[in-house]
Amino acid sequence: EGEHGEEEHEDGHGHEEGPTVFSNEATELSVSLDLSSGERIRRVVLNHAMEEISIIGEEAFMAPVDSTETTLGFFSSDDVGFATLDIGLRFDQIERDGFIAEMHHEEDHDDDHDEDHEGDHDEDHEGDHDEDHEGDHDEAMEYDPFSFSDEVFSAAATLRRDLNEHASLSLGLASVSKTPSAVELFMNGEHLASSRYEVGDVNLDTERSDNIDLAFTFDSHNWFGSAAVYYNRVDNYIYLRDELEEEHAAHMDEDHEDEHGEHGDHGGLILSEYTQQDADFTGYEIEVGARFALPRGEFEVTLGRDEVDAEFTDGRAVPRIVPARNMLTARYTLDDFSAKLLVKDVERQTDVAMGETVTEGFTLVNADASWSYGFNDSTRLTLTAFARNLTDEVSRNHTSFVKDQVPLPGRNIGVRVRLAF
């Protein structure tokens, strides 16, 4: 495995291999046992997965990682008289075997060698000498094997009560563990898709999220809707932290003093490191709608909004959080024909983390119209016309690392034909 890691580096170091190839080979075995009896639901699931992730080519920013994950899960659902109680339990055993990549600086010639040849060339050959020894200071990536393993337990329970035949109320409690991914542990290199030099951390701890949510739903005749609020307390929340400008300047000064400035610059990319910190997430989702029976067909309109606030326990904002959104959907159906109009208003995101910039709000207007025809019970033809971003508005996704360089797509109009048989 160590030799394989070196081969990945040698391919990526020269930047001459062509396109990057992301390989993810996985083998998974799952066994499910249903122990239900009558209205009492009992299920047990055992899942075993082996996965190998490798990245080869010019953008080979992570040595191969082998992961083994074994999961034992249990689910039950019972009518406890005044409500329905759902319980889920899960035990995970995770092991990831990868490599820690570190940059190693080498000199091709020692000082004694240089002194012996100091006078061998006259001034006419000084330029040639400099060119011949331009690569005396080489940078090589060294790989040391490392294994991460952990055993974690998660539990969730939901109590759901029907208030009447049209409305219900549910309360959910959960404590969920998430081990660091292969990327979060072993990433080390240029990730051109995000314009960053990303660095993982093999010392990351397992995340634990303690959650509570309350939801209300109703569907009465022509009116329907739902509302939910939630609070998540995440210990050891894992995220990518961008290097600040002043930190970059300080590192560049240090690298200049050490005569290794090229490495400190990271090829002009932003240095972004996986790190973790305790965080709180609070949010809500609300939707209300109405149906109208027309002389021909049915018309439905829905209005919704969602918003989340995420802060670290020291009061700083969590980076790349989705801004508040308002959505209006109108849908018309008649037999095999349907049409939909979606207006999505994304608000300005001003609650930004250190190093982030404010993202302006935008409004997207999308439309679809489709007609289908069934030739028989198993064959159906569907013709769809669609339009995205009808107003051709410039819009940027606040959660994207490259929001300033790559805006969301502009106006897009097209037709799709689908034949299912």
Task: Explain the meaning of each model-derived region.
Residues 1-108, 136-139, 144-162, 168, ...:
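Face-selective signature of the C-terminal outer-membrane beta-barrel domain
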Residues 29-37, 72-78, 157-161, 214-220, ...:
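Residues on the lipid-exposed face of transmembrane beta-strands in outer-membrane beta-barrel proteins
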Residues 36-40, 80-83, 162-166, 209, ...:
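Outer-membrane beta-barrel channels and translocator barrels
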Residues 50, 93-107, 136-137, 141, ...:
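Surface-exposed extracellular loop regions of Gram-negative outer-membrane beta-barrel proteins
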Residues 230-234, 245, 251-349, 391:
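Gram-negative outer-membrane beta-barrel transporters
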